[in-house]
């Protein structure tokens, strides 16, 4: 069984979502519940044609429990579920989504498979983001709208000057808050 590990949302200064956990699924197979392995193989291949027929056949015959596919899309989960196969087990897990990853990837960072922050804001505020006694989200001083405008201008400047990379920092001089931080 997969453990569910929750993590708080990260928001910008205006309450715009930067990062959130969602429940996603892995598909596993419990072979003792598969009645007709040939039919099962054909049905699964219709939904997941990228799977190796040979490996799937081998796993069905040699394994008691194996992963069919990790990190299913919603469409894949729905189609597999609609097959009505009792041998397909859906294991929930918490996946971290970053709706504005193109704007914040260097700043927000990422988490590992066990939901521990390994870089950026995710690492620095790891303890706070995992504190289940307080459901308040982490609100940053960053502004998504300003971040977008500055990123666009920085990209244009990189093109004009044929630069390999660039960075920008916008800080409120009165209080020290970071409004935008970009690295390209």
What are these regions (language model features)?
Residues 4-48:
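Juxtamembrane extramembrane loops of integral membrane proteins
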Residues 5, 34-38, 70-74, 115, ...:
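Soluble non-cytosolic domains of exported or imported proteins
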Residues 6-16, 162-184:
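A short, well-structured edge-of-sheet supersecondary motif
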Residues 21-26, 111-112, 180-184:
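Short beta->alpha transition motifs characteristic of CBS
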Residues 45-49, 85, 112, 151, ...:
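Sec-exported extracytoplasmic/periplasmic mature domains
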Residues 46, 58-136, 140:
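Small/polar-residue-rich segments within soluble enzyme cores
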Residues 129-166, 171:
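Conserved, well-ordered alpha-helix/loop/beta-strand core segments that scaffold catalytic motifs
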